[in-house]
UniProtKB/Swiss-Prot annotation:
Organism field: Rhizobium meliloti (strain 1021)
Known cofactor(s): FAD; FMN
GO molecular function: nucleotide binding; sarcosine oxidase activity
Quaternary data: Heterotetramer composed of subunits alpha (SoxA), beta (SoxB), gamma (SoxG) and delta (SoxD).
Keyword Oxidoreductase: yes
Family affiliation: Belongs to the SoxB family.
Binding site for FAD: 41-42, 63, 71, 76, 78, 206, 366, 368
Subcellular localization(s) per the UniProt record: Cytoplasm
GO biological process: tetrahydrofolate metabolic process
Protein name, entry field: Sarcosine oxidase subunit beta
InterPro entries in alphabetical order: FAD-dep_OxRdtase, FAD/NAD-bd_sf, Rhodanese-like_dom, SoxB
Gene: soxB
Length: 416
């Protein structure tokens, strides 16, 4: 069924009794050309582009829980492409361009809202760094504007300009950045992949990877053995655990990243604002709630919840940027498991094990990269060679010394 204003109207008049399920609930087949482990945004996007762009439809997406129960539904919904380094900039700009046409592409309302992302700066050195970043963006054809104090104050008068410990000097603005409804992204890709013949198999946990003569031939699951010609791992924070089933150790640590939403408030934040003197970012949802987050919890964990020390740290940073937040009540919080790589950049590559491919190490950048990640991973699986914008995301770059360290923090995953 194709969604349209007319179909919504007609089904509403009929009591919404004639809607077809958005995707099937198939039983697994004995063998697939490609099995994708992980039914999150990246896994579903990979399946969608494999079918749509490369004509490979004998594909299964295996999800141990329900579709969208992982990180794709546990983030703060921000999209942007304001990256500095050559390895990152073209890739995230590809993702931004795919976001811009996504709803028309898969005929699903993902609520893409390009309302701008503003990164505040608070010192001369930070201003110079943002100027450099903005110039690099513009050289790659990405929009960027450097705003000074008066322009920022006119745009966001509720920020603390008069009594701030770290005075606001200005900000770097990307107007094409914004937010997207994260659940709708998972549902849209799932619906699009399923309509092209992909099997989305929920409540099917991978418990082992079967190898024969040094190559992967399938996976052991809670629903039995399923064979495959190629196995693609897109398991986010659980990537290390799944790869270990094949005897592969990854340069990745898993950390919890918490996110929060407040009570509904009168609209006052038009776009996304990030605090340059602390790790804090905030936007306002359609319901009026403030959606915000900050640093990861600094210890390794696979729990989808965090600790109170980080909650306090995030609240302090938010209050320093917007003093009025001190009176706002938090409704709920949640956590996602971040696959933190050694240099803060992702891995999209084949592994040393034949027929085993990896999509992992996304750190904070996973959600905003969803379309490009799926497209580039599908290209790798279909063609056997990396897509040009993802060519730098090799697994062996740590051994070769070709790191993509956007923040310049060195080989310490919990700092990226």
């Amino acid at each position: 069924m194709r969604y349209s204003a007319l179909s919504i109207l007609l089904n509403g008049l009929r009591g919404n009794r004639n809607w077809a399920p958005a995707w099937r609930q198939p039983d697994p087949k004995p063998h697939y050309d490609v099995i994708i482990v992980g039914g999150g945004g990246h896994g579903l996007a990979t399946a969608y582009y494999l079918a749509k762009e490369f004509g490979i439809t004998n594909v299964a997406v295996l999800e141990k829980n329900y579709i969208g129960s992982g990180n794709v539904g546990r983030n703060t919904t921000i999209i942007r492409s304001n990256y500095l380094l050559p390895g990152n900039n073209p890739f995230y700009e590809l993702s931004m361009k795919l976001w811009e046409g996504l709803e028309q592409d898969f005929n699903f309302n993902a609520m893409v809202s390009q309302r701008g992302v503003l990164n505040l700066f608070h010192s001369d050195a930070q201003r110079d760094a943002y100027t450099r970043r903005g110039n690099a963006m513009r050289l790659h054809g990405v929009d960027a504007e450097l705003l000074y104090r008066a322009a920022v104050r006119k745009m966001l008068p509720f920020l603390d300009f008069d009594n701030a410990r770290f005075p606001i000097q200005g900000g770097l603005l990307q107007r094409r950045g914004g937010t997207v409804r994260h659940d709708a992204v998972a549902w849209g890709y799932a619906r699009g992949a399923d309509s092209r013949g992909v099997d989305i198999i929920q409540n099917c946990e991978v418990t082992g990877i079967r190898r024969e003569n040094g190559r992967v031939i399938g996976v052991e699951t809670s629903r039995g053995f399923i064979g495959c010609a190629k196995l693609a791992l897109a398991a986010a924070g659980n990537s290390s655990q799944v790869a270990e089933m094949a005897g592969l150790r990854l340069p990745i640590e898993s950390h919890v990243l918490q996110a929060f939403v407040s009570e509904g408030l009168k609209p006052f934040i038009d776009g996304v604002v990030t605090f340059g003197a602390g790790h804090f970012y905030v936007s306002q949802s359609d319901k009026g709630g403030l959606v915000f987050g900050g640093d990861i919890d600094g210890y390794n964990s696979y729990a989808q919840r965090g600790n109170l020390a980080t909650v306090e740290h995030v609240a302090e940073a938010g209050k320093a940027m917007i003093p009025a937040l001190s009176r706002v009540r938090v409704l709920r919080s949640w956590g996602g498991i971040m696959d933190m790589s050694m240099d803060g950049s992702p891995i999209i590559d084949r592994t040393p094990i034949d027929n085993l491919y990896l999509n992992a190490g996304w750190c904070y950048g996973g959600f905003k990269a969803t379309p490009a990640s799926g497209f580039c991973f599908a290209h790798l699986l279909a063609r056997g060679a990396p897509q040009k914008t993802a060519a730098a995301f090799r697994l062996d770059r740590f051994e070769r010394g070709f790191l993509i360290d956007e923040k310049g923090q060195g080989a310490q995953p919990n700092l990226h």
